[in-house]
């Protein structure tokens, strides 16, 4: 019986994923006792890009932006997504699924109007979910 595929691969072949934009949760949530090493995006097996939920936050400084403004938070969120996709070697045109989390249904129109500017002609499957809160109180959309 053959060994597992992993054990037969040469070390350089074992890198199946490209990881983009590392960060640690203690930078995003300094008031919490978290210390997790994560990435904003991962290109898996050179075929699919997985993004961490994006919010209105500067990817470098972790500064939260546009508190209370759903449209501007959405614009920053979409800019982050576009940047991460670019780093992964693709574009918004390749997006086939998007899930949006809102903290209040009243933000839906502003959020979807802004998202529509970024996804015009793309036609992804989209799901919107209203939640009681996101990880930070100033975030209204993710």
PLM region descriptions:
Residues 2-93, 97, 102-142:
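N-terminal presequence-like segments and the immediate start of the first folded domain
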